UniProtKB/Swiss-Prot annotation:
Cellular component annotations (GO), alphabetically ordered: cytosol
Classification via HAMAP family: Phosphopentomut
EC number: 5.4.2.7
Family to which this protein belongs: Belongs to the phosphopentomutase family.
Cellular localization per UniProt: Cytoplasm
Name of the protein: Phosphopentomutase
Catalytic activity, reaction form: 2-deoxy-alpha-D-ribose 1-phosphate = 2-deoxy-D-ribose 5-phosphate; alpha-D-ribose 1-phosphate = D-ribose 5-phosphate
GO molecular function: magnesium ion binding; manganese ion binding; phosphopentomutase activity
Keyword Manganese: yes
Enzyme class: isomerase
Free-text remark on how the cofactor is bound: Binds 2 manganese ions.
Top-level taxon in the UniProt lineage: Bacteria
Positions with a binding annotation for Mn(2+) 1: 9, 323-324
Length: 389
């Protein structure tokens, strides 16, 4: 048997009860994107019950969903990739990761400059595409590294591939990760952001690389691997969990490459969890407030669903979800604190089952463990009995 999780990165379905605290009142990535473009065409997801989860123009509710559907609420404080993915696999944070609305303090920047031998420019919260436009010429002239953060807990380093070769940029990220770990600050990710081209038309390349904090405790993926259930990671999953509980991984260039590589695993592996993150929704469209691009990417994914379902074996179970929101229609370019969809399909999965509002994303990881007959973890409630006879 195989379980397949596909995370539509940032495809939230409406504000969490505490969204106002995060400045995200009214956010609804799916609903607002659909409205902004005059409706979404997602017939395959609609048949799985997507339209039953929130009002999505063009995706009406169905009286008979082909699988189980519900919403998941995030128990951890935060609204970022790491927090969401860790919670899927059983880690519920007590305190959010550290943020740097005024940039990073001297006790981080000074040793970083010293160890890399390069000056830092920027050191402020910024949109990645905007800051390379703003500081790219200075970076090209001086070789200084563009360091920036966002409303997430991230230390990002942008560099032109002709000024700083990618392997060198990765080395600088490892230096930053070490300094941050030793500093006592809890920073979720260090991210390499290489770009190419000429000012002002720079393009970020797919050679991005994330250096995550290791998970704070044992995650469901590790339980699986210890019990002989392999875990195959597609996209940035391996980076998010810092390699913990991952048997094999592949990187992806874009969403469609991610779907192709997921299909490769579905065709070739006999047992295990195939765990995919499709990042374009978030990276290319959510943060750039581009609802048209976001809508097109959602429709492109939906068009591939029959292929995914058609490749599955009778005892496989597919889970489609998201890790947070990133509403492209709000003035903010940051993530939004939202509920996430939960769509479950398989030939043996009961049809038209409403799974309700799950109290934590950890219900997903707990259900995966239950499906493979692995001992439960501390957090989360399995919904295996609700979806299988």
């Amino acid at each position: 048997m195989r379980a397949i999780i596909i995370v539509l990165d940032s495809a939230g379905i409406g504000e969490m009860p505490d969204a106002e605290k995060y400045g995200d009142k009214g956010s609804n990535t799916f609903g607002n994107t659909a409205k902004a473009v005059g409706g979404l065409h997602m017939p395959n997801s609609q048949r799985l019950g997507l339209g039953n989860l929130t009002d999505i123009l063009g995706v009406p509710p169905t009286d008979h969903a082909l699988g189980a559907y519900g919403r998941m609420l995030e128990k951890s404080p935060g609204k970022d990739t790491t927090t969401g993915h860790w919670e899927f696999m059983g880690i519920i944070l007590e305190k959010p990761f550290d943020m740097f609305p005024n940039g990073f303090p001297p006790e981080i920047i000074e040793p970083f400059e010293k160890e890399t031998g390069r000056k830092v420019i920027g050191n402020k919260p910024a949109s990645g595409t905007e800051i390379i436009k703003e500081l790219g010429r200075e970076h090209e002239k001086t070789g200084a590294l563009i360091v920036y953060t966002s409303a997430d807990s991230v230390f990002q380093i942008a560099a032109h591939e002709e000024i700083v070769p990618v392997p060198e940029l990765y080395k600088y990220c490892e230096i930053a990760r070490k300094i941050l770990n030793e500093s006592g600050y809890k920073v979720a990710r260090v991210i390499a952001r290489p770009f190419i081209g000429e000012w002002p038309n720079y393009t970020r390349t797919p050679r991005r690389h994330d250096y995550s904090l290791p998970p704070e405790g044992k995650i469901a993926l590790e339980y699986l691997v210890e019990n002989g259930v392999p875990v195959y990671a597609v996209g940035k999953i391996n980076d998010i969990y810092d390699g913990h509980g991952i048997t094999e991984y592949v990187k992806t260039k874009d969403n469609m490459d991610g779907v192709d590589k997921t299909l490769d695993y579905i065709r070739k592996v006999d047992k295990g969890l195939i765990f995919t993150n499709l990042v374009d929704f978030d990276m290319k469209y959510g943060h750039r407030n581009n609802p048209e691009g976001y809508a097109k990417a959602l429709e492109e994914f939906d068009a591939r669903l029959p292929e995914i379902i058609g490749t599955m074996r009778p005892d496989d179970v597919l889970f489609i979800t998201a890790d947070h929101g990133c509403d492209p229609t709000t003035p903010s370019t940051d993530h939004s604190r939202e509920k996430v969809p939960l769509l479950v399909y398989g030939r043996h999965v009961k049809e038209n089952v409403f799974l309700g509002e799950r109290e934590t994303f950890a219900d997903l990881g707990q259900t995966i463990l239950d499906l493979f007959g692995v001992e439960p973890m501390e957090n989360g409630t399995s919904f295996k009995k609700e979806i299988l006879d």
